[in-house]
A protein has these predicted regions:
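Short loop/turn segments that connect beta-strands within beta-propeller blades
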Residues: 2-5, 62-66, 107-111, 153-157
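A flexible loop/linker signature enriched in serine peptidases of the S9 family
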Residues: 11-18, 31-59, 70-79, 93-104, ...
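Non-catalytic accessory segments flanking enzyme active sites
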Residues: 19, 94, 101, 113-202, ...
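Residue-level recognition of a conserved intra-blade site in WD40 beta-propeller repeats
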Residues: 22, 84-86, 128
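Hydrophobic beta-strand positions that form the internal "hydrophobic ladder"
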Residues: 26-29, 90-91, 133-136
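Short beta-strand element of the alpha/beta-hydrolase
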Residues: 197, 204-215
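Active-site-proximal cap/loop segments of hydrolase catalytic domains
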Residues: 226, 235, 242-449
Length: 449
C-alpha cells in the first residue's frame, strides 16, 4: 500500500510460481506458474502423479478474497503473459501451441480463449498499443519465412504487412515442400510431425531419410533459422521427418507429463514406431538409408535410440547426454532440469532411471555409425558426456567419431567453427546415407598412428 507503506502477504510460500502482474483495476493478480502452483489446482495431467513443471499455466487471484482460479487448466497450449489490456479488459498470451507459437486472447467475463488469426505460424514478438485496443504490432515467421513484421487490427481481425526484410534473399532460394504428417501410436495417441521434401523432389526416385527430434520437454518449433532446420537437410537431397514425441509442452498437460521420470523410454519407442510407419507410407524413402539427428536432450535421444534399434544407417548427436547421473551432478543445469524431468528421483532412490536409461550403460548394444559433437566448454551438458561414450564405443570396436568444437559452449556461435561443424554433420550423413565419403575424407583424412 503506497499510502500506508504496509505490505500484505498474498502468497506465503509457493516454489511453483513464476511471474505476477496486477489487473488494470488493481483488484486481481494474474500469476503464471507450474500446474503444481497453489496446491495443484491447475493440474490436469490424467493418471500421471507428477505434472511437468515446464508446462506453464495461468491463474487469477482475487485480492479481496484471496481465491485463485486456474484459467488454463483445460487449455492445451503453454502460456506466457503478453499483456492484460486496460482498454478491452482481455488478457493476451504468447503460447507454445504444438509446433507453433500463437497469440491467444482470454476474455475474463466469459472464461473463453480466442486465437488471433495472425499471418505467421510462429509469433516471436507481439505488442498492443497502450491506449488503443484496436492496434497491435507483431513479428513472426514459419517454415518459409522469418522476421516478417505486421500491424494488426483486433476489431477487423486483419493484418497489414509492414516489413519483410528477408524476402529478397528467400526469393532466391528454392525451398522444399513441407506438410504435416501424423501417426497414431500403439496407445492411441496422435503423434504430430512434419515432412520436408527436397526442392527438386522426384516421386519416382528413392531418397535417404533423416529423422530429426528434440524429444525433451519442448517441441521442435517451425522455422528456417535453426541450425537443424529441415530445409537445410532437404537441400542436400534428403527427405526429412520431424517428429514431436510424447513429453513436449504445448499439447496438453497429460502429454507433457509423460516426460517426467521417463528419460527416453516412451519417446524412443514412438520415434522408432513413427519412422517405420513414415517409411511404409512414403515409397520414395529408402528404408535402408535412414539417419537420425538431435542435440542436447535430442543428442541424448540419438545415443539412447541406438541402444534400442539398428534401423538407422547413421546417427549424429550434438551435446548429447550419455549418463543421466553424471549430467545430473556435473553441469550447471543438470540438477535443476532433473528436478522437473526426474522429479523426486535421485541416483540413490531410483538408480535404474539414472543408469539404465543412459547409452553409456548400454554401449554394447550400439552398432550404428555414430558421430558425437561437443563444445569443449559446454556448461549445460559437459563434454564428458560425449567423451565417455566415445571411449566405451572405441573399446567395443564400434563405428564412432568424435568432433570437439574448441571454446564453444552448448551452442556453436563462432561463425567459422559453426560452418565446419555444420559441414561435418552433412559430410557424415553423405558418407553413410549417400555413398559419398569424399567430403568426410577431405575434412578428416584418415590417420595412421
Amino acid at each position: 500500500d503506497l499510502t500506508t507503506l504496509q505490505a500484505d502477504t498474498l502468497v506465503a510460500w509457493d516454489a511453483y510460481l513464476g511471474s505476477a502482474s496486477y489487473s488494470p483495476d488493481g483488484k486481481q493478480l494474474l500469476v503464471t506458474g507450474s500446474p503444481s502452483a497453489f496446491g495443484g489446482i491447475g493440474k490436469n495431467c490424467g493418471e500421471h502423479p507428477i505434472a511437468n513443471d515446464f508446462d506453464t499455466q495461468a491463474f487469477i487471484m482475487d485480492l479481496a478474497t484471496k481465491k485463485v482460479q486456474a484459467i488454463t487448466r483445460d487449455f492445451n497450449p503453454t502460456v506466457s503473459l503478453v499483456q492484460w489490456n486496460r482498454v478491452d479488459g482481455c488478457i493476451y498470451f504468447d503460447t507454445t501451441d504444438g509446433d507453433c507459437r500463437h497469440i491467444y486472447r482470454y476474455v475474463p467475463k466469459t472464461g473463453g480463449f480466442e486465437m488471433l488469426p495472425l499471418e505467421e505460424d510462429v509469433i516471436t514478438s507481439f505488442t498492443l498499443a497502450n491506449d488503443n485496443p484496436v492496434v497491435a504490432a507483431y513479428v513472426g515467421g514459419g517454415n518459409t519465412s522469418t522476421g516478417v513484421a505486421y500491424t494488426y487490427d483486433t476489431k477487423k481481425k486483419v493484418s497489414t504487412l509492414l516489413a519483410n526484410p528477408m524476402k529478397p534473399i528467400l526469393d532466391k532460394i528454392e525451398l522444399g515442400q513441407m506438410e504435416e504428417w501424423n501417426f497414431t501410436a500403439s496407445d492411441g495417441t496422435e503423434i504430430k510431425g512434419m515432412i520436408c521434401l527436397p526442392p527438386s523432389f522426384d516421386p519416382s526416385k528413392k531418397y535417404p531419410l533423416i529423422v530429426y527430434y528434440y524429444g525433451g520437454t519442448t517441441p521442435t518449433t517451425r522455422g528456417i533459422t535453426s541450425p537443424y532446420c529441415a530445409q537445410l537437410f532437404a537441400s542436400r537431397d534428403y527427405v526429412v521427418y520431424v517428429i514431436q514425441p510424447s513429453g513436449a509442452i504445448g499439447y496438453g498437460q497429460e502429454f507433457s507429463a509423460r516426460h517426467v521420470n521417463a528419460w527416453g523410454e516412451r519417446t524412443a519407442d514412438e520415434i522408432i514406431d513413427g519412422t517405420k510407419k513414415f517409411c511404409a507410407a512414403h515409397p520414395f524413402v529408402n528404408d535402408k538409408r535412414i539417419g537420425c539427428l538431435g542435440a542436447s536432450y535430442g543428442g541424448f535421444m540419438t545415443m539412447y535410440l541406438q541402444t534400442k534399434t539398428d534401423m538407422f544407417a547413421a546417427a549424429a548427436s550434438h551435446a548429447g547426454i550419455s549418463n543421466v547421473t553424471s549430467y545430473w551432478g556435473e553441469g550447471y543445469w543438470g540438477y535443476s532440469y532433473n528436478s522437473v524431468a526426474a522429479a523426486d528421483s535421485y541416483p540413490w532412490n531410483n538408480p535404474d532411471l539414472f543408469t539404465k536409461h543412459g547409452a553409456l550403460f548400454n554401449a554394447d548394444k550400439i552398432n550404428t555409425p555414430l558421430l558425437l559433437l561437443h563444445g569443449t566448454v559446454d556448461t549445460n551438458v559437459p563434454i564428458g558426456e560425449s567423451i565417455q561414450l566415445y571411449n566405451a564405443l572405441k573399446i567395443l570396436g564400434k563405428p564412432v567419431e568424435f568432433i570437439t568444437v574448441d571454446g564453444e559452449n552448448h551452442f556453436v556461435l563462432d561463425y567459422a567453427k559453426r560452418e565446419l561443424w555444420h559441414n561435418s554433420i552433412m559430410a557424415w550423413f553423405a558418407r553413410w546415407l549417400q555413398d559419398s565419403p569424399a567430403w568426410w575424407n577431405d575434412l578428416y583424412p584418415e590417420r595412421h598412428w
